[in-house]
Design a protein with these regions (language model features):
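N-terminal Rossmann-like FAD-binding beta1-loop-alpha1 element of flavoenzymes
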Residues: 4-31
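Dinucleotide-binding Rossmann-like beta1-alpha1 core, especially the glycine-rich loop
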Residues: 47-119, 125-127, 274-276
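C-terminal catalytic lobe of FAD-dependent flavoproteins
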Residues: 139, 279-356
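Active-site substrate-recognition segment that forms the wall
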Residues: 20-24, 47-49, 84-89, 172, ...
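Glycine-rich FAD pyrophosphate-binding loop
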Residues: 23-45
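Helical element adjacent to the flavin cofactor pocket in flavoenzyme catalytic cores
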Residues: 130-179, 183-187, 191
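Helix-loop-beta segment of a Rossmann-like dinucleotide-binding subdomain
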Residues: 84-95, 107-153, 253-258, 312, ...
Length: 356
């Protein structure tokens, strides 16, 4: 039986990014994915690189800033390796804060009503609006590009094969058992997102947090002039994400609903109405589709990054709503840790061992 240097459990944006990074450092890498790569939380995500969000936990601030800085180069590499154009937009975000809230993000500025009307004439909301110098990306294209880039670098993949157990001998990980087979490796990395805690031994406390979204499109297809709005818009009720082809995404709920991915029509109507309240011209667009995804939550709402109590078994999960944002820096830091280098940023606050 072939033995790999590393097995990555889970082929989402985190697993793919890490696999690609480890392969570039000379490791022989296998991704084992329960369904198809980049088709769960990655596929369902909005793709905001919300690096200026004032509600980012303090413990994450350095990782968030570093990852956002890496994004343009990260995307350029993926485009070069995959041959697919990734829709990375840099128009920025218009965010509505609570009374008295301010942004301390470099380059952020408060918007007057006149300036807001000039930069987004279709946006009718007024209030404590700020411009934030953030990026956004189409995660579905990003996921496809990551799959192709990983294959380009020589990462092996097994799909349609859920991992049920991490194999161990002599106090260390030796591979994984799936519902269909076994695979051997010198180390195992659990990047299974919301499903990470379902893999035995059950020492990774993740849970699914449901999010529903809806996509609207112009009647008759996308306008030649591009999207109706240029900026991502974040209000207390909804976030509105334009794509370069004219689609607009509206999201997203935060629901403790287990592994249920049912789309609720009333919820979708409320999201759509919140979008129309902000951008009335959106009422002339039609609903294209709606979906639900499962984010990986943790007890303290921080990612789980590091080696578990089983030698050679690493957890890289629990990114909650920030998996797309944190993918580049997570891949860099965990590749450094796994290959015996000192990570450029401190990962101790995210250690799996913090849960006892």
């Amino acid at each position: 039986m072939k033995t790999w240097d590393a097995i990555i459990v889970g082929g989402g944006v985190i697993g793919l990014s890490l696999a690609r990074r480890l392969k570039s450092q000379g490791l022989d890498v296998l991704i084992v994915e329960k369904h198809e790569p980049a088709r769960e939380a990655t596929y369902a995500a909005g793709g905001m690189i919300a690096s200026c969000d004032p509600h980012i936990p303090q413990e994450l601030s350095l990782l968030v800033a570093a990852s956002a800085k890496l994004y343009p180069e990260f995307v350029q590499e993926l485009q070069d390796e995959s041959g697919e154009a990734v829709d990375l937009r840099d128009a920025g975000t218009v965010a509505y804060f609570g009374s008295g809230e301010v942004s301390e993000c470099a380059g952020a500025r408060q918007l007057t009503d006149d300036v807001l009307s000039h930069i987004e004439p279709s946006l009718q909301l007024r209030g404590n609006a700020w411009f934030l110098p953030e990026l956004c990306v189409d995660p579905r294209v990003l996921g496809r590009s990551l799959v192709q880039a990983a294959k380009h670098r020589g990462v092996d993949m097994v799909t349609g094969s859920p991992v049920i157990e991490v194999l161990a001998a002599g106090g260390g990980a030796t591979g994984v058992r799936t519902t269909q087979s076994e695979y051997a490796a010198g180390l195992v990395v659990n990047c299974a997102g919301a499903w990470a805690g379902q893999i035995a031994p059950p020492s990774i406390p993740t849970r699914p947090v449901k999010g529903q979204m809806v996509c609207v499109v112009p009647h008759g297809g996308a306008p030649h002039s591009g999207p109706l709005i240029q900026h991502v818009v974040r209000t207390p009720e909804v976030y509105i994400i334009p794509r370069s082809d004219g689609r607009i995404l509206l999201g997203a709920t935060v629901e403790e609903a287990g592994f249920d991915k049912t789309v609720d029509p009333d919820t979708i109507r409320k999201l759509h109405q919140a979008g129309v309240d902000a951008v009335p011209a959106m009422a002339k667009m039609r609903i294209h589709d709606a979906w639900a995804g499962l984010r990986p939550g943790t007890p303290d709402n921080l990612p789980i990054l590091g080696e578990t109590s089983l030698r050679g078994y690493y957890a890289v999960t629990g990114h909650y709503r920030d998996g797309i944002l944190l993918a580049p820096i997570t891949a860099q830091l965990m590749a450094e840790l796994i290959t015996g280098c000192k990570p450029a940023l401190d990962l101790q606050p995210f250690s799996p061992l913090r849960f006892g």
